[in-house]
Amino acid sequence: MRNAVIVGYKRSPFTFARKGEMANIRPEDILSQTINQLLNEIQINKNDIEDIITGCAYPEGAQGNNIAKIVSFMTDMPEHVAGMTVNRWCGSSMQAIHDATGAIAINSGDVFLCCGVESMTFIPMNGLTYDPHPQLSKDNPNVYMSMGITAENVAKKFDISRKEQQDFAISSHSKANSARETNMLDNEIVPITNNDQIINKDGGIRPNTSHEILDGLKLAFDENGTVTAGTASPLTDGASAVIVCEEEYAKKNNLNILARIKSTCLLYTSDAADEEDSVDLGG
């Protein structure tokens, strides 16, 4: 059995969509800069790269045309290096790692670039043209459930109060701000440039978040719910890249092995026993 290992990783800063520092930077540029800086640090022969596998939830518009292959031309890859875009919604970039792990196991390559990219500025939630199937959306509207409603369903199912959500949000922002201010994230974040602008810090952190502020926010998704804009996932622009390679290749090339991927799995998002509730959590 050929083992897959991770030998390097980088990400761009994550900034607010539409109003953040990277709102006017195309997703291909964010991803290609992330890849370039990863490969500048981890010295791998580009000729050894089998495939660039890129997760993207909305592969259309600026993120369309197989963005994984598009960025190969923006990162000076040899022509034979392939590119594939995969979509498993929020798990898309993780799926890229799953695919590389499986390919390595069956001897379909030694080195893979596994990436993720999303500019929710360029491609908004629900894509450029939202067009659900008329009959399916009528018969089973949960198929098209949004992440906001998913959050509400999780809160209801596991009895997570608004206060508990706000406690977690405040703690999360505080920890993230502490990490940012003490430069603990600098080893994983690469600076993204846009003309004379350099973005090298996460932009979605609100260190002054408090219960007083969060208490004043309106409910975002359900008038009888608990989730607000202050406790929901933000709309974000960003990219990431990981080098996954075969273990013996890593050792032969003196690469620092950070992790070994022993197995992968897919997990259904509902633990409901009866069929009526089987899609109540969303995905």
PLM region spans:
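Flexible glycine-/small-residue-enriched beta->alpha junction loops
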Residues: 105-154, 158
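Beta-strand segments within the central parallel beta-sheet cores of soluble alpha/beta enzyme folds
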Residues: 47-55, 82-87, 112-116, 164-171, ...
